From Swiss-Prot:
The gene is SNMP01. It comes from the Eukaryota. InterPro entries: CD36_fam. It is a multi-pass membrane protein. Keywords: Cell membrane, Disulfide bond, Glycoprotein, Membrane, Olfaction, Receptor, Sensory transduction, Transmembrane, Transmembrane helix. This is Sensory neuron membrane protein 1. Disulfide bonds join 262-327, 291-346, 329-335. It is found in: Cell membrane.
Length: 514
């Protein structure tokens, strides 16, 4: 077999092998291996991290101090000064675990525990904060919505419990407001005060200080307290379903919003996502505090610690314009403007949520107070997501809690209030994986990069070999075969020559015949 043919056959075989293995088999092998690893089956590494996150999340709180409370009582816009951060470690775990292998599901209750943390710029919590009293404002706004005829009773109760206050504002330390509790004096004897206090004593989020007094805080009741029960798919049978919520609080869908679509649980609880999500799918996660699933959308690509990742961002949408979000409107005829959501139907309290500093919200909210400076870097929601394994490598989830201010002539301390939305505080839940957790990802991508480079080099080599073999083959085929000419001497065996040429026609015996 000629050399060019041998080269061509060898290169063709090599080309087929590299196409089959490098471009088809190896990617499928990696994909299959990753899918087999990303599940919540008992004993899996992912489940261990899902059940108890092996590191603390950075939890920061920023509070808004109202610097002109008495002016606000007269109708002026609130002037705000941001105070913070107040820093905490947040440890996440799941408790009371149970599994159903036939359904490929697991059950759990989430539990978040907060510990005070120190760090650059972190405040100790002793700072005094002036803000609208959440209970006074909350009680009045709730009664106005649900039982407006009882407003005079509430007015008397406020005077009784809070000692005839001259404003809706209170001043307390940051730690008392956030965790330790602001005391509510419920040892009153009048009918209105006792009626309201009897309701407050049944509220699960208020701490009983003693027989009469209660204490209110924003985050204290949730600290180290198991939440309601989840039922999620483990992803053993189908990796694309890993972590997907099937039930929450023993319900297959919510009973909060007016449409079936908005009452659906979409996505996971935010601590695990399926591998190989497409950009178009987004990152869907259910937030129990909002009674809503939020979907972070793809917005670009970048690198984190050398790992290629996607950038996802999220907002609260615009219920006033988006048809799919009309279900979140407080009433069919009343929708909040862009970037704002009312939690009254969800939590039973008139609290509005937005992004910090009203970022990505209607401009009227920003102009309704003084002192805000919304910007993407500090106030947006951003997730850096590694799509192969389905893991966030860096994230900043931010949310601001607000309460509406509305004038009400039936209550003296509400009579001249401005009509605006007042920010109370905002939180940031952050995570950034260190080298301990990114190294396995970097090793995986290093192997994939080496294989990618090698397969292209081998393929180019094979194509080059085929080209060289073809050149050699056709070059040989075009050459002419020339036979060399040798001088012939006369024979010495009696053969005659005529005219100097050898006569091959007659031998000596033939001549003798004549």
């Amino acid at each position: 077999m000629r050399l060019p043919v041998k080269i061509a056959i060898g290169c063709a075989i090599g080309l087929v092998v590299i196409i089959v293995f490098g471009f088809i088999a190896f990617p499928k092998m990696i994909k299959g291996k990753v899918k087999s690893m990303i599940n919540l089956n008992k004993g899996s590494e992912i489940r261990q991290m899902f059940v108890k996150v092996p590191f603390a999340l950075d939890f920061k709180i920023y509070m808004f101090n109202v610097t002109n409370p008495m002016d606000v009582q007269k109708g002026a816009l609130p002037v705000l000064k941001e105070v913070g951060p107040f820093c905490f470690e947040e440890w996440k775990e799941k408790v009371d675990l149970d599994d159903n292998d036939d359904e490929d599901v697991m059950f759990y209750n989430p539990k978040d525990t907060f510990y005070k943390a120190n760090g650059p710029g972190c405040l100790d919590g002793s700072q005094m904060i002036t803000m609208a009293h959440p209970l006074i404002l909350g009680m009045v706004n709730t009664v106005v919505r649900t039982k407006p005829g009882a407003i005079s009773l509430i007015s008397k109760a406020i005077n009784s419990i809070y000692g005839n206050p001259d404003s809706i504002f209170m001043t307390a330390s940051a730690m008392d407001i956030l965790f330790d509790g602001v005391v509510i004096k419920c040892g009153v004897k009048d009918f209105a005060g006792k009626a309201v206090c009897s309701q407050l004593k049944e509220a699960p989020d208020l701490r009983h200080v003693d027989e009469n007094d209660l204490a209110f805080s924003f985050i204290g009741p949730k600290n180290a307290t198991p939440g309601k029960r989840f039922k999620v798919l483990r992803g053993v049978k189908e990796s694309h379903d890993v972590g997907r919520i099937l039930e929450y609080d023993n319900k297959k869908e919510m009973e909060v919003w007016p449409t079936k679509e908005c009452n659906q649980y979409k996505g996971t609880d935010g601590t695990v996502f399926p591998p190989y999500l497409t950009k178009e799918e987004g990152l869907a996660s259910y937030a129990p505090d909002l009674c809503r699933s939020l979907v972070a959308v793809y917005s670009g690509d970048t690198k984190y610690d050398g790992i290629p990742v996607r950038i996802y961002t999220a907002t609260l949408g615009d219920m006033s314009k988006n048809a799919d979000e009309k279900c979140y409107c407080p009433t069919p005829d009343t929708c909040l403007k862009k970037g704002m959501m009312d939690l009254f139907k969800c939590a039973g309290v008139p609290v509005y949520v937005s992004l910090p500093h009203f970022y990505e919200s209607d401009e009227s909210y920003v102009k309704g107070v003084v002192g805000l400076n919304p910007n993407k870097k500090d106030h947006g929601i951003q997730i850096l997501f590694e799509s192969t394994t389905g893991g966030p490598v860096k994230a900043a989830k931010r949310l601001q809690f607000n309460m509406p201010l509305e004038p009400n002539p039936k209550l003296p301390i509400f009579a001249n209030l401005p009509n605006t939305v007042l920010p109370l505080f905002w939180v940031e839940e952050g995570v950034a994986l260190n080298n301990t957790f990114t190294k396995p990802l970097k090793d995986l991508f290093k192997i994939m990069k080496i294989v990618k480079i090698a397969k292209w080099l081998i393929m180019l080599g094979c194509l080059g070999g085929l080209g060289a073999a073809g050149y050699l083959y056709f070059s040989k085929k075009g050459e002419a075969n020339i036979t060399p000419v040798h001088k012939v001497k006369p024979a010495e065996n009696g053969v005659s020559t005529l005219g100097g040429e050898v006569n091959h026609a007659m031998s000596d015996n033939e001549i003798e015949k004549y």
